[in-house]
A protein has these predicted regions:
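STAS-typified acidic loop motif
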Residues: 20-42
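A short, well-ordered alpha-helical element
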Residues: 40-58
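Terminal peptide-recognition signature
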Residues: 33, 62, 82, 123, ...
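Gly/Ser/Thr-rich loop/hinge elements
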Residues: 70-122, 160-164, 177, 181-188
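Short, small-residue-biased leader/transition segments that mark boundaries at the very start
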Residues: 1-8
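C-terminal soluble interaction/assembly domains
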Residues: 143, 152-168, 173-175, 194
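Short acidic catalytic loops
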Residues: 33-34, 54-69, 125-126
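Low-complexity, Gly/Ser/Thr/Pro-rich intrinsically disordered linker/tail segments
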Residues: 194-224
Length: 224
């Protein structure tokens, strides 16, 4: 699961870059965006540029495999381009005491639609077990939108606000200080299942093909 930067680079495929995202148009007129790190900034100008370039495409693949997270603001900015209305995407809880279960009542989280260019067609989001933290939150938001399907493997989880510390022996510890629940108030800390599970095939890999991208392309062709 290496995304645009590897398989397609070896095929000599051209792609554009806007902020932290790489994007291109595949042969069957399907748009493809690879966002490998939400720590890499993306602004509204970047998102306008990408969606304008891909606007004639019949469908869109957003690849966040191996995206270990980063800045939740970037993840939210991107998600806002895929809804036309304010959508409840989950809840967050905050620690209120030292007890194991001392948490506040769940506070709702909404994604508001962007007031700029918004994508109106089908979207497939590609995920794997290395999609963590802010990426997990992004995937959780995206699956609340009616035109979005998740394909690949379960995400790595780790939503919520991370807390980092160092133990006396020098080991680092990192955990979610504020549990994040989905819209049905279920925990998503341990990952989000795809709508369709697809594994990489060794044969495809040897032929410089990405099984999961190929499956997403097939699915988008069927739904067009």
């Amino acid at each position: 699961s290496r995304g645009l930067g590897d398989v397609y680079k070896r095929q000599g495929r051209d792609y554009r870059i806007a902020g932290g995202a790489k994007y291109t148009i595949l042969e069957d007129n399907i748009g493809y965006i690879y966002y490998g790190d939400f720590s890499s900034g993306i602004g509204n100008g970047n998102l306008d540029e990408i969606l304008l370039y891909l606007s004639a495409c019949n469908g869109l693949i957003i690849d966040v495999r191996n995206n270990g997270g980063g800045n939740l603001t970037n993840a939210t900015l991107m998600a806002q381009r895929f809804t036309n209305e304010k959508i409840l995407t989950g809840y967050i809880q905050h620690k209120t005491g030292k007890g194991h279960n001392d948490f506040s009542d769940p506070t709702p989280i909404y994604v508001e639609p962007s007031n700029s260019i918004r994508w109106q067609k089908k979207v497939i989001v590609l995920t794997n077990r290395h999609s963590y933290s802010a990426t997990n939150d992004f995937v959780n938001s995206m699956r609340c939108f009616p035109n979005v399907t998740l394909v690949g493997d379960k995400t790595g989880g780790g939503s919520g606000l991370p807390f980092s510390s160092e133990l006396p022996n020098g080991w680092g510890v990192r955990f979610s200080a504020s549990p994040h629940l989905d819209a049905q108030k279920q925990h998503i800390e341990f990952g989000i299942d795809p709508d369709k599970k697809v594994d990489m095939s060794k044969e495809d890999e040897n032929n410089d093909l990405d099984t999961i991208i190929e499956e997403a392309r097939k699915m988008l062709k069927v739904t067009l």
